[in-house]
């Protein structure tokens, strides 16, 4: 038997001559190289925002989870299913934190079938509870991309034109068992303006590549658990909207939270409309959010009124969605030895010890790398610009 020629396979390219990346400092330590790699990873997401482009702010997303027998593989610990469900709990929390006026639903596919784990909803606690219960789910059979996408499309095609229609598939298997030609379904999805993205857990699959390319989505295959989490995080921010999507004014209601007690003689107990589609038994309560149009009561916001269809939100919900449209500009990176100002971070008041500091171009305040990442990822506004006190006009 002839020996296999010594050439690097394409998938091994990232591991070729890895020792050349590591460089020793004057004392022979590799710490500086490792810190530089971690530093670049921290700064990477700061530059990944879309800039001032048109975004789909009101999102409707279905997450399709592969429940086939391949999800029992233990290359992710303790297995693919448990790891996926834990990361999806994190994803749901981040999704609603960054997109409070959006909705999400979960579909599971196994044994050549697909079924909804949760309906399209804006209640994160409902989804997280279902994900926790799904840990005991039995994985068997093959997945069906066709059936999963058909179920998602049945709901998404009726969504208003000004909202984004998205599907995110977590695909573990290398095969799909479909009852009909999936390429015809891909054309239908494209015509319905449904964007489909795929995260692969095994290897690249041709049909997933075509699906993502034709519908305008993305397709990535994970390297490890940390990369898996990073790929999920990419789907938290709203995608750029197509130029053909509708523009329209949306009626919204801003109900105030009414607090009543048993001692209040005018208070009248009432049922919450949110219990109509829930498994919990409805109960009479005093307080809540009352729709300004039809006076229907709800326990939490945001929600679409089941009586009159009005979208009920609070002002902070819109404010948290607004920052996607006008993202904070990246701070200017300056070597520490070239910076002549105070050597303390404006955000955490810690001493600046890193090789680089970050200066806001507007208020000229300086930040460390951790505060820079926190400001751009979570705060979305410069604390120096907010607290900048203008000089009195008489001076």
Curated annotation (Swiss-Prot):
It comes from the Eukaryota. Changing residue 345 to A: No effect on the transcriptional activity of the reconstituted TFIIH complex. Changing residue 363 to A: No effect on the transcriptional activity of the reconstituted TFIIH complex. The modification Phosphotyrosine is found at residue 95. InterPro entries: C1-like_sf, Ssl1-like, TFIIH_C1-like_dom, TFIIH_SSL1/p44, VWF_A, vWFA_dom_sf, Znf_C2H2_type, Znf_RING/FYVE/PHD. Residues 60-236 form the VWFA domain. Signal peptide: none annotated. Widely expressed, with higher expression in skeletal muscle. GO terms for cellular component: core TFIIH complex portion of holo TFIIH complex; nuclear speck; nucleoplasm; nucleus; transcription factor TFIID complex; transcription factor TFIIH core complex; transcription factor TFIIH holo complex. Changing residue 360 to A: No effect on the transcriptional activity of the reconstituted TFIIH complex. One of its GO terms (molecular function) is zinc ion binding. Changing residue 380 to A: No effect on the transcriptional activity of the reconstituted TFIIH complex. One of its GO terms (biological process) is regulation of transcription by RNA polymerase II. Component of the TFIID-containing RNA polymerase II pre-initiation complex that is composed of TBP and at least GTF2A1, GTF2A2, GTF2E1, GTF2E2, GTF2F1, GTF2H2, GTF2H3, GTF2H4, GTF2H5, GTF2B, TCEA1, ERCC2 and ERCC3. Component of the 7-subunit TFIIH core complex composed of XPB/ERCC3, XPD/ERCC2, GTF2H1, GTF2H2, GTF2H3, GTF2H4 and GTF2H5, which is active in NER. The core complex associates with the 3-subunit CDK-activating kinase (CAK) module composed of CCNH/cyclin H, CDK7 and MNAT1 to form the 10-subunit holoenzyme (holo-TFIIH) active in transcription. Belongs to the GTF2H2 family. Component of the general transcription and DNA repair factor IIH (TFIIH) core complex, which is involved in general and transcription-coupled nucleotide excision repair (NER) of damaged DNA and, when complexed to CAK, in RNA transcription by RNA polymerase II. In NER, TFIIH acts by opening DNA around the lesion to allow the excision of the damaged oligonucleotide and its replacement by a new DNA fragment. In transcription, TFIIH has an essential role in transcription initiation. This is General transcription factor IIH subunit 2. The lineage of its organism: Eukaryota, Metazoa, Chordata, Craniata, Vertebrata. The gene is GTF2H2.
